[in-house]
Swiss-Prot record:
The active site is at residues 13, 41. Its main location: cytoplasm. The gene is purA. It comes from Rhodospirillum centenum (strain ATCC 51521 / SW). Disulfide bonds: none annotated. It is an enzyme of class 6 (ligase). Pathway: Purine metabolism; AMP biosynthesis via de novo pathway; AMP from IMP: step 1/2. It catalyses: IMP + L-aspartate + GTP = N(6)-(1,2-dicarboxyethyl)-AMP + GDP + phosphate + 2 H(+). IMP binds at residues 13-16, 38-41, 130, 144, 224, 239, 303. Substrate binds at residues 299-305. Keywords: Cytoplasm, GTP-binding, Ligase, Magnesium, Metal-binding, Nucleotide-binding, Purine biosynthesis. CDD domains: AdSS. Plays an important role in the de novo pathway of purine nucleotide biosynthesis. Catalyzes the first committed step in the biosynthesis of AMP from IMP. Its EC number is 6.3.4.4. This is Adenylosuccinate synthetase.
Length: 430
């Protein structure tokens, strides 16, 4: 039995929700280990649709332990709203079924205010933040001024910590010409939310160690994607945490050997939300068609996603930097009916062909894709549940992707429906 980490191998929005739901039905524990409530996904179980952004996917399934690890930045108000929403749909959420690491950093209302004020001040240089305070909260964590969940139970230190926070952030807001945060109002907001969120606080590393020793199946659920990783992504157009699977251990309080299989969720084409380099982006009718067929709009923000051809260079890089064992290829059915498909196999940069995405911002914006062209297929792949159901040209496309990214396709998804999945290997099996 192997514990599994699920991560995105592109810029997020790869279809992790369906795959994580499929895997979480077989896991005992589901752990979120990084990010905040800036990325979301939709689960459909029976006739009920659940939109989650902070809660682990296992929360909607009875008998599963859901864990929010120390690597997550938690907005208590957003978390409680999400809990209320799924409770209204019949899901039981209690401090016995949901644990939040007592040492996780909190997102407070001031973080959203700072996030939005700074993004507005950037003008044409916006980085595409959701404005929900995730970046500023991570900054406070690294700068050692964050208020953590455990602090809400300690009145002796809480007010001093709030003073320290406001000294820093109100200076920023003044400099940006934005309204300052009122201390009394912030303290009242914290006092109101504390008794509602503290029951979920737990010594998460200890509970996960107990689960490991009991040989429970643990699923680590990543948010966003490898190319949004703060170190390995298209910096500065990235998120504020490490999204690669290596962070599953640090972000949950477990050792580096805890993950036995890393599954990289990979869309059969490429999408991106917000600003930043996108070598294979299509701004023509083909790109528009991909977006319409794939329903490429954000779960949380509703923002339209940019669309383009599959970028094997980028995915291979994500596989290497993220330790991905195998990929789950999603949305193959979106490519049905295209007479011709293209896959990026290299970049042209300064007169040479390179096979990696450069780290420099100027170089990332300047690379031009080198394509390999494939014959498309007219038949439908939607709902296929075996290789025999796929057109030969679709099989050829998938096999060539495996060769180019240097990793096997472990799962193949052919529709949003949970059971429309072709399984080549069970990630939970050793």
């Amino acid at each position: 039995m192997a514990n599994v980490a699920v991560v995105g191998s592109q810029w997020g929005d790869e279809g992790k929700g369906k795959i994580v739901d499929w895997l979480s039905s077989r896991a005992d524990v589901v752990v979120r280990f990084q990010g905040g409530h800036n990325a979301g996904h939709t689960l459909v179980i029976g006739d009920v649709e659940y939109k989650l952004s902070l809660l682990p996917s296992g929360v909607v399934r009875p008998g599963k332990l859901s864990v929010i690890g120390n690597g997550v930045v938690v907005d208590p108000w957003a978390l409680l709203r999400e809990i209320d929403t799924i409770r209204a749909k019949g899901v039981t959420v209690t401090p016995e079924t949901l644990l939040v690491a007592e040492n996780c950093a909190l997102i407070l209302p001031l973080h959203g205010a700072v996030d939005r004020a700074r993004e507005e001040a950037r003008g044409a240089s916006k980085i595409g933040t959701t404005g929900r305070g995730i970046g500023p909260a991570y900054e406070d964590k690294v700068a050692r001024r964050a208020i953590r969940l455990c602090d809400l139970a300690d009145d002796r230190v809480l007010e001093d910590k709030v003073d320290h926070l406001l000294f820093h952030h109100n200076a920023l807001l003044r400099g940006l010409g934005a309204a300052e945060i009122d201390k009394a109002e912030l303290m009242a907001q914290i006092a109101e939310v504390a008794p509602r969120i503290l029951p979920y606080a737990a010594v998460v590393w200890q509970r996960l160690d107990e689960a490991k020793r009991a040989r429970k199946r643990i699923l680590f659920e990543g948010a966003q994607g490898a190319m949004l990783d703060v170190d390995h992504g298209t910096y500065p157009f990235v998120t504020s945490s490490n999204t690669v699977a290596g962070n599953a251990a640090a972000g949950s309080g477990m050792g580096p050997g805890v993950v036995g299989y890393v599954l990289g969720i990979t869309k059969a084409y490429t999408t991106r939300v917000g600003s930043g380099p996108f070598p294979t982006e299509l701004t023509d009718a083909t790109g528009e068609q991909l977006g319409l067929r794939g329903r490429e709009f954000g779960t949380v923000t509703g923002r339209k996603r940019r669309c383009g051809w599959f970028d094997a260079v980028m995915v291979r890089q994500a596989i290497k930097t993220g330790g991905i064992t195998g990929i789950a290829l999603t949305k193959l059915d979106v490519l049905d009916g295209f007479s011709e498909l293209k896959v990026c196999t290299g970049y042209r940069y300064q007169g040479e062909i390179i096979h990696h995405l450069p780290a420099g911002q100027t170089a990332q914006a300047a690379v031009e894709p080198v394509y390999e062209t494939f014959q498309g297929w007219s038949e439908s792949t939607r709902g296929a549940r075996s290789w025999a159901d796929l057109p030969a040209t679709a099989v050829k496309y998938v096999r060539r992707i495996e060769e180019l990214v240097e990793a096997p396709v472990t799962l193949l998804s052919t529709s949003p429906e949970r059971d429309d999945t072709i399984l080549m290997r069970d990630p939970f099996e050793d």
